[in-house]
Amino acid sequence: MKLKNLLQDIQIIKTNVDMEMEVSSVAYDSRKVVNGGMFVAITGFATDGNKFIPMAMVKGAAVVVTSKQPADGVPFVQVASDRLALALIGCNYYGRPGESMKLIGVTGTNGKTSSTLLLKHVLEQVLGAKVGLMGTMENMIGDVSIPTERTTPESFELQALLAQMRDAGCSHAIMEVSSHAIALERVAGLHYAVGSFTNLTEDHLDFHKDMEDYCDTKAQLFRRCDQAVVNLDDSWFERMCKDATCKLLTVSAKGKAGLYAENVELLSDGICFTAVYGEKKVPVRLSIPGKFTVYNALNVLGMAMQLGISLEDAAAALATAKGVKGRVEVVPTPGKDYTVLIDYAHTPDGLENVLSSVKGYCKGRLIAVFGCGGDRDPIKRPIMGKIGTDIADIAVITSDNPRTEDPETIVSHIVAGVSKDKNNYEVIVNRVQAIHHAMDIAQKHDIIVLAGKGHETYQEVCGVKHHMDEREIVAEYLEKTRN
């Protein structure tokens, strides 16, 4: 591909190469550079890609794209932003695949995964569409699942995945759009037919300087959409929407909005409500419990309508949707009269939502097993300690991906937030032992909520991911204690 075509729409500061030259490939990892290819040097947080320009040259790089002035003798194109350049190079290299499909982008702290999976189900059921999905749990092309390591892939891989979706015949691509993805230009060059804002609560403050920065970063999505669905009940609603350039549909579970819920019923096996849109009133039933499911359902109904699906058809499709893995997921406990649920709740708001929802229908005691991740925003740890012990009858505070931090230090931060008058908690740092203990003390009608891991099947300790599937832990302990 000609260099000038790869660099279309990119702000160039300086170059010493012929724009008519042919480029064989693109890489931003110097180890993947091939003869005649392009190396994009990314100035990262931990590593500066410019340090690897000599290695790229040894491997045969024909041109280096960088935001810095390289050493003499290096064929280069200097650009204003290396991350933005990588994203747009990806768009150009793969033939702008996003323009061949309707793109849907969902942002927010909680609810992104459930909303994207439910919308995929609605589009498939109502339109018979082949739908691509990029998310926290997995990437999908139709029914084919592709493992994922981050919510939104790096920009070049993202464009490659969109190209796969296009080539496989997908008419729609639904994406979870994280604040990291927006800030790091991973979704640059994409324009969304529909966007969505679920909610905003404290998270990722290890990356963003404050909540205002976190909000403003996510709000950029609404300058890249034709239409969007926004949660009117969220406290960040006004700031989120103030600079939006797209048509907005508000949703609410508390009062009137463009689309809102009334007659809400929270049941042990799901939720029911009436969706109101203008003069229309449509019953909605979804077999996923929790008040947050009402918001996810409204979000999905709104996006479906913006994509041309009637409220009635979207609601009918939602009624056939199954639960989402790791989201209020019931774990089989044969022979036991207590219930075990797994949920991805790993933020203060997420933990409060799931525990409050379960508490609403729990006939026995609510036992919460939870922790906080290492190398992440420490501010939320005491907040989650207070929430967990305030709502649950019994809390078991434990580890959840300590990464490079000392697990006992993390746990001490969580315990620091517990009210002085509370004695309803235990600290068991080993997560497997914590789960075993919760099962040992569970009685008839009790519900155990294993919060934090959700769909994850690992525990990350000292930078190494060790296999840990809570479904297996529960099943194996039941088998062991049965014998």
Predicted features along the sequence, with ranges:
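Acidic, Mg2+-coordinating active-site environments of NTP-dependent enzymes
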Residues: L3, D9, T66, P70-G73, ...
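A short, gly/pro- and small-residue-rich
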Residues: G49-A62, F76-A85, A193-N199, D216-K218, ...
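Phosphate-binding loop of NTP-binding sites
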Residues: L7, L86-L232, W236-K247, Y277, ...
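ATP-dependent carboxylate-amine ligase
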Residues: M1-K14, N35-M38, L84, E124, ...
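A short acidic, helix-capping loop that chelates divalent metal ions and anchors anionic groups
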Residues: D72-G73, M140-S145, E202-F207, R376, ...
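Short, ordered loop/turn segments at secondary-structure junctions
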Residues: K68-P70, T136-M137, S179, L200, ...
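N-terminal leader/targeting and accessory segments in enzymes
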Residues: M1-L88, A257-E265, K281-P283, P289, ...
